[in-house]
C-alpha cells in the first residue's frame, strides 16, 4: 500500500528595509514602471541570495525554474508559506531615510502527479510599490520661496501560477509556468492644498520556461546546470486620476497605460556535496522596454550575478 506523507514547510525569511504596514518595499525607485520587481522571495532561495536557476532538492518547490520540481520527494505533498522582513536605507542630496518592512511573500502547494510529471500551484508577488518622500523646490520668480511636494505610493502586482515539471530522461528535466498577473498601484502627489492620486490596475496571462541537466559527478556529489526564459508580454493598465482640492474631488478616466513584463533569460548551476550546496546564477532582464510618463526617466537593462551557499544541519 502506498503511503503519502504531508510536509508543512513554513519559512520566516530574514533579510534587511522599513516603513508601511502592508508594503514589501520602501524604495523610491518603486514609483517607476511596474514597481520593484520580485524574484526568489521564498524558502531556501532567499537565504541563498535568491539563486534559483540551478537549484533542485527534495523539499524545494522551485517556481522560478519549474524544471526543478522534478526533484521533489515523490511520496510527499508539499505546502510552503513564506514571509520576510528587511531594512533599507537611502541617501540623496545630503538627506537620508530608512525603513523597516515585511510581509507575506509566497504560498505554494505541490508534489508529484504522475511518474514523470510534477506540479505546483500558488500565489507570489510579481512587483512592489511602496515609497514616501518629500521634495522642496524654489519657486521660479520668487527667490527664497520654496514649494514642498510629498510623494507616496502603495500596491503592486501579484502572480498566481500553475507550474509543471517533466522528467524527460534520468538526467534532463523541463518545466513551464502558466501565470496570471494582476494587481493595482496607487501613486499620490500632495502639493499645498491639492492632491493628485493616480490609480492603475491591470491583468495579463503569461508563461515562462525552464530546463535543468542534473547528474552525480562523484560519491555524494551532484551537479545541476539550468536555464530559464520569459518572453516580453504586454499588459494594459486602467488609469484613473483623481484631483482633490480644498472643497472638491474630481476623478478623470485617462487613456489606458501600456506597459510590458520584461523579457528575461537566466543561466545557473548548483553543486551539492553531502550537507553543503553551492549555487551561482546570471540573470539578464530587459527593463529597457518599460515605458515612463516622465521623459527624464529612462530604463536600462539589468545584469545580475547571484551566489549562494547552504548548509543542512544534522536531522534535516
Language-model-detected regions and their locations in the chain:
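Generic recognition of cysteine residues
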Residues: 6, 11, 75, 166, ...
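Transmembrane beta-strand segments of Gram-negative outer membrane beta-barrel proteins
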Residues: 27-52, 70-87
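Outer-membrane beta-barrel translocator/receptor signature
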Residues: 55-134
Amino acid at each position: 500500500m502506498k503511503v503519502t506523507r504531508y510536509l508543512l514547510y513554513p519559512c520566516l525569511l530574514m533579510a534587511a528595509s522599513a516603513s508601511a504596514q502592508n508594503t514589501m518595499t520602501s524604495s523610491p525607485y518603486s514609483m517607476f514602471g511596474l514597481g520593484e520587481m520580485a524574484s526568489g522571495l521564498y524558502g531556501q532561495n532567499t537565504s541563498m541570495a535568491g539563486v534559483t536557476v540551478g537549484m533542485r532538492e527534495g523539499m524545494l518547490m522551485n517556481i522560478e525554474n519549474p524544471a526543478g520540481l522534478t526533484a521533489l520527494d515523490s511520496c510527499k505533498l508539499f505546502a510552503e508559506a513564506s514571509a520576510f522582513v528587511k531594512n533599507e536605507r537611502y541617501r540623496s542630496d545630503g538627506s537620508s531615510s530608512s525603513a523597516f518592512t515585511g510581509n507575506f511573500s509566497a504560498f505554494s502547494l505541490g508534489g508529484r502527479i504522475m511518474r514523470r510529471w510534477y506540479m505546483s500551484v500558488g500565489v507570489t508577488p510579481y512587483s512592489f510599490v511602496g515609497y514616501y518622500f518629500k521634495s522642496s523646490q524654489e519657486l521660479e520668480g520668487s527667490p527664497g520661496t520654496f514649494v514642498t511636494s510629498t510623494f507616496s505610493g502603495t500596491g503592486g502586482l501579484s502572480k498566481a501560477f500553475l507550474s509543471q515539471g517533466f522528467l524527460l530522461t534520468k538526467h534532463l528535466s523541463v518545466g513551464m509556468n502558466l501565470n496570471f498577473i494582476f494587481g493595482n498601484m496607487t501613486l499620490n502627489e500632495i502639493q499645498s492644498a491639492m492632491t493628485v492620486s493616480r490609480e492603475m490596475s491591470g491583468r495579463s496571462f503569461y508563461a515562462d520556461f525552464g530546463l535543468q541537466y542534473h547528474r552525480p559527478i562523484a560519491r555524494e556529489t551532484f551537479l545541476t546546470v539550468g536555464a530559464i526564459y520569459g518572453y516580453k508580454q504586454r499588459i494594459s493598465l486602467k488609469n484613473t486620476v483623481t484631483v482633490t482640492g480644498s472643497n472638491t474631488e474630481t476623478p478623470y478616466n485617462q487613456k489606458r497605460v501600456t506597459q510590458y513584463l520584461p523579457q528575461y533569460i537566466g543561466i545557473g548551476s548548483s553543486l551539492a556535496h553531502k550537507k553543503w550546496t553551492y549555487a551561482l546564477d546570471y540573470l539578464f532582464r530587459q527593463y529597457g522596454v518599460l515605458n515612463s510618463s516622465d521623459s527624464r526617466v529612462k530604463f536600462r537593462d539589468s545584469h545580475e550575478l547571484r551566489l549562494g551557499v547552504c548548509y543542512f544541519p544534522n536531522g534535516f
